[in-house]
A protein has these predicted regions:
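Short beta-strand element of the conserved SAM-dependent methyltransferase core
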Residues: 56, 80, 154-158
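Conserved Nudix-box catalytic region and its N-terminal flanking loop in Nudix hydrolases
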Residues: 21-23, 28-31, 83-119, 124
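Unchanged
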Residues: 103-193
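Acidic, metal-coordinating catalytic segment for phosphate/diphosphate chemistry
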Residues: 35-79
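Conserved beta-strand and immediately adjacent loop positions that scaffold enzyme active sites
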Residues: 79, 87, 174
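N-terminal leader/capping segments at the start of a protein or of a new domain
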Residues: 1-47
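Short hydrophobic/aromatic beta-strand or adjacent loop that forms the aromatic wall/cage
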Residues: 1, 77, 149-153
Length: 206
């Protein structure tokens, strides 16, 4: 199952897995009637005032891939779930509990970007990656352009959880480690793309 999130709603493709998508498509693949139809639907879904999820079944990965490329500019990012003493690191940005993440720079792989962004946003050092987690996908409007952000998540450890330094120039006001008792609150108040994608992983690790 593949999901794209926009604000607190989701577009769900139950018969497609993320690994089936190929977002490196040629211009000729963008011109079919099916691709045009899904592209138009995506544009309508982004602007219509809906609160419920929408499910689209029976679509091929090839058509969806081409429609996504036609509709969005890709903005890949990477981030981390940092563990220490049975807790995980969360940040507060714009008053919303979140996880540290940021854009992948040119020439970086996702793992390197995740380590860099987590250290920059939290001040945590001594970071090591344990394993990769599921990828979240959400879209947003930036300077009149719709963007689709796949965020590649990694489970991490830190050897020094006692020293944090929130990146205030990125509007991060707090870095804190949350326990299993805080998890329900976090999942209820964070972005749905994080709660749906990483919720079970966080429950397992805490």
């Amino acid at each position: 199952m593949y999901k794209i999130f926009y604000e607190q709603r989701a577009l769900i493709f139950p018969n497609i897995e993320e690994k089936e998508l190929d977002l490196d498509v040629t211009s000729t693949q963008l011109e079919s009637y099916e691709v045009e139809k899904i592209h138009n639907f995506l544009r309508q879904w982004l602007v219509v005032n809906l609160t419920e999820d929408v499910t689209i079944d029976g679509l091929s990965p090839e058509v969806l891939s081409a429609a996504l490329v036609r509709t969005f500019r890709l903005a890949p990012a990477a981030g981390g779930v940092v563990l220490a003493d049975g807790q995980f690191a969360a940040i507060e940005r714009h008053g919303i509990p979140d996880l540290p993440k940021g854009h992948i720079e040119e020439g970086e792989d996702a793992a390197t970007a995740a380590l860099r962004e987590v250290e920059e946003e939290t001040g945590l050092t001594g970071l090591t990656i344990i394993r990769q987690l599921p990828t979240s996908w959400h879209c947003y409007l930036y300077e009149d352009e719709w963007r689709l952000k796949p965020t590649y998540w990694f489970l991490m450890n830190t050897s020094d959880p006692d020293h944090t330094n929130p990146q205030t120039d990125e509007d991060i006001t707090e870095v804190t480690f949350l326990s299993e008792y805080d998890l329900e609150w976090f999942l209820k108040n964070t972005y749905r793309s994080i709660a749906d994608t990483l919720g079970e992983e966080l429950k397992t690790e805490n």
